Amino acid sequence: MMLTAQDLQAEQAYHIGKRQMHNRCLHGCRVACGLGVTLRRKYVYIDPGMALDCHGNEIVVPETVKMSLPQRKRRFFLTLSYVEVETGRVPSPFTEGDHHREEFSRIQEAYTLGWSARDPLSAHDWHLGAWAACGQSHPLSLAKFTIQRGQIKLSRSFQERVNASRDTLGSG
Protein backbone atom coordinates (compact mmCIF):
# COMPACT_ATOMS: atom_id res chain seq x y z
CA MET A 1 0.00 0.00 0.00
CA MET A 2 1.35 3.40 -1.00
CA LEU A 3 0.97 6.48 1.18
CA THR A 4 -0.62 9.31 -0.84
CA ALA A 5 -0.94 13.06 -0.44
CA GLN A 6 -4.59 12.48 0.45
CA ASP A 7 -3.54 10.16 3.30
CA LEU A 8 -1.15 12.78 4.68
CA GLN A 9 -3.78 15.53 4.41
CA ALA A 10 -6.31 13.34 6.25
CA GLU A 11 -3.80 12.68 9.03
CA GLN A 12 -3.03 16.41 9.36
CA ALA A 13 -6.74 17.29 9.44
CA TYR A 14 -7.34 14.67 12.14
CA HIS A 15 -4.57 15.95 14.43
CA ILE A 16 -5.46 19.61 13.88
CA GLY A 17 -9.10 18.83 14.67
CA LYS A 18 -8.15 16.99 17.87
CA ARG A 19 -5.95 19.89 19.03
CA GLN A 20 -8.72 22.40 18.28
CA MET A 21 -11.24 20.29 20.21
CA HIS A 22 -8.82 20.10 23.16
CA ASN A 23 -8.38 23.88 23.13
CA ARG A 24 -12.14 24.54 22.91
CA CYS A 25 -13.18 22.06 25.60
CA LEU A 26 -10.39 22.53 28.13
CA HIS A 27 -9.35 26.16 27.69
CA GLY A 28 -12.20 28.03 25.99
CA CYS A 29 -11.69 31.27 24.11
CA ARG A 30 -9.01 33.34 25.83
CA VAL A 31 -5.66 35.07 25.87
CA ALA A 32 -3.07 32.46 26.84
CA CYS A 33 -0.12 34.80 27.36
CA GLY A 34 1.01 38.31 26.50
CA LEU A 35 -1.13 40.43 24.15
CA GLY A 36 -1.16 43.37 26.53
CA VAL A 37 -2.64 46.53 25.00
CA THR A 38 -1.22 50.02 25.57
CA LEU A 39 -2.75 53.29 24.38
CA ARG A 40 -0.31 56.08 23.46
CA ARG A 41 -1.69 59.19 21.77
CA LYS A 42 -3.18 58.12 18.40
CA TYR A 43 -1.73 54.61 18.53
CA VAL A 44 -2.35 51.27 20.19
CA TYR A 45 0.51 48.87 20.89
CA ILE A 46 -0.15 45.14 21.19
CA ASP A 47 2.48 43.03 22.95
CA PRO A 48 3.57 39.64 21.55
CA GLY A 49 1.58 36.69 22.83
CA MET A 50 -0.85 33.88 22.11
CA ALA A 51 -4.63 33.43 22.25
CA LEU A 52 -7.20 30.73 21.52
CA ASP A 53 -10.28 31.54 19.44
CA CYS A 54 -13.70 29.89 19.78
CA HIS A 55 -12.84 27.31 17.13
CA GLY A 56 -9.75 26.24 19.09
CA ASN A 57 -7.25 27.87 16.73
CA GLU A 58 -3.99 29.01 18.29
CA ILE A 59 -3.30 32.64 17.36
CA VAL A 60 0.31 33.73 17.74
CA VAL A 61 1.44 37.37 17.59
CA PRO A 62 5.25 37.03 17.48
CA GLU A 63 6.23 40.69 17.91
CA THR A 64 4.89 44.03 19.13
CA VAL A 65 2.37 45.58 16.74
CA LYS A 66 1.57 49.30 16.41
CA MET A 67 -1.87 50.29 15.10
CA SER A 68 -3.48 53.65 14.43
CA LEU A 69 -6.71 54.32 16.29
CA PRO A 70 -9.81 54.33 14.10
CA GLN A 71 -12.25 57.20 13.67
CA ARG A 72 -15.10 55.79 15.80
CA LYS A 73 -17.87 57.11 17.97
CA ARG A 74 -18.56 56.31 21.64
CA ARG A 75 -16.97 52.84 21.97
CA PHE A 76 -15.07 50.29 19.92
CA PHE A 77 -13.16 47.04 20.40
CA LEU A 78 -9.73 45.85 19.29
CA THR A 79 -10.09 42.35 17.84
CA LEU A 80 -7.72 39.51 16.99
CA SER A 81 -8.54 36.84 14.39
CA TYR A 82 -6.93 33.63 13.16
CA VAL A 83 -6.29 33.42 9.40
CA GLU A 84 -4.61 30.95 7.09
CA VAL A 85 -2.53 32.33 4.22
CA GLU A 86 -1.70 30.19 1.20
CA THR A 87 2.01 30.36 0.32
CA GLY A 88 4.60 28.48 -1.72
CA ARG A 89 3.53 28.91 -5.34
CA VAL A 90 4.49 25.92 -7.48
CA PRO A 91 3.66 24.94 -11.06
CA SER A 92 0.42 22.98 -11.17
CA PRO A 93 0.92 19.41 -12.38
CA PHE A 94 -2.75 19.15 -13.36
CA THR A 95 -3.01 21.68 -16.17
CA GLU A 96 -3.80 20.81 -19.74
CA GLY A 97 -2.23 23.16 -22.24
CA ASP A 98 -1.60 25.95 -19.71
CA HIS A 99 1.97 25.35 -18.53
CA HIS A 100 2.11 28.64 -16.61
CA ARG A 101 -0.63 27.85 -14.10
CA GLU A 102 0.46 27.77 -10.46
CA GLU A 103 -1.07 26.67 -7.18
CA PHE A 104 -0.15 27.01 -3.53
CA SER A 105 1.73 24.23 -1.76
CA ARG A 106 1.67 25.48 1.84
CA ILE A 107 -0.62 27.12 4.39
CA GLN A 108 0.86 29.60 6.86
CA GLU A 109 -0.99 30.36 10.09
CA ALA A 110 -1.30 34.10 10.68
CA TYR A 111 -3.50 36.68 12.40
CA THR A 112 -5.31 39.92 11.71
CA LEU A 113 -6.02 42.77 14.10
CA GLY A 114 -9.08 44.90 13.55
CA TRP A 115 -11.67 47.24 14.99
CA SER A 116 -15.29 46.45 15.75
CA ALA A 117 -18.21 48.54 16.96
CA ARG A 118 -19.41 45.60 19.06
CA ASP A 119 -17.72 43.02 21.26
CA PRO A 120 -17.57 39.75 19.27
CA LEU A 121 -17.67 37.78 22.54
CA SER A 122 -20.62 39.61 24.12
CA ALA A 123 -22.99 36.65 23.59
CA HIS A 124 -20.57 34.16 25.15
CA ASP A 125 -20.66 32.93 28.74
CA TRP A 126 -17.75 33.89 31.01
CA HIS A 127 -16.72 31.01 33.26
CA LEU A 128 -13.56 30.38 35.29
CA GLY A 129 -11.45 32.96 33.48
CA ALA A 130 -12.47 32.17 29.89
CA TRP A 131 -15.26 32.71 27.44
CA ALA A 132 -17.10 29.51 26.57
CA ALA A 133 -15.97 28.43 23.10
CA CYS A 134 -18.86 28.31 20.64
CA GLY A 135 -16.93 26.29 18.03
CA GLN A 136 -17.03 29.04 15.39
CA SER A 137 -13.99 30.86 14.09
CA HIS A 138 -14.53 34.56 14.78
CA PRO A 139 -12.55 37.45 16.28
CA LEU A 140 -11.48 37.56 19.91
CA SER A 141 -11.76 40.86 21.83
CA LEU A 142 -8.46 42.17 23.19
CA ALA A 143 -9.49 45.63 24.39
CA LYS A 144 -12.41 48.02 24.72
CA PHE A 145 -12.07 51.74 24.05
CA THR A 146 -14.51 54.53 24.86
CA ILE A 147 -14.53 58.20 24.02
CA GLN A 148 -15.16 60.38 27.06
CA ARG A 149 -15.17 64.18 26.70
CA GLY A 150 -13.29 63.88 23.42
CA GLN A 151 -10.58 61.66 24.92
CA ILE A 152 -10.06 58.01 23.99
CA LYS A 153 -9.89 55.75 27.05
CA LEU A 154 -8.81 52.13 27.38
CA SER A 155 -11.34 50.27 29.57
CA ARG A 156 -9.54 49.02 32.68
CA SER A 157 -12.37 46.67 33.71
CA PHE A 158 -12.36 45.04 30.27
CA GLN A 159 -8.56 44.71 30.46
CA GLU A 160 -8.84 43.07 33.88
CA ARG A 161 -11.17 40.44 32.42
CA VAL A 162 -8.82 39.78 29.48
CA ASN A 163 -5.88 39.59 31.89
CA ALA A 164 -7.83 37.22 34.17
CA SER A 165 -8.26 34.86 31.24
CA ARG A 166 -4.53 34.94 30.62
CA ASP A 167 -3.57 34.53 34.28
CA THR A 168 -5.83 31.52 34.96
CA LEU A 169 -4.68 29.42 32.00
CA GLY A 170 -2.87 26.41 33.34
CA SER A 171 -3.49 27.24 36.98
CA GLY A 172 -5.93 24.54 37.29
Q: Where would I find each of the regions flagged by the language model?
A:
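N-terminal "first-domain core" detector
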Residues: 1-45
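Beta-strand-rich solenoidal segments
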Residues: 43-46, 50-172
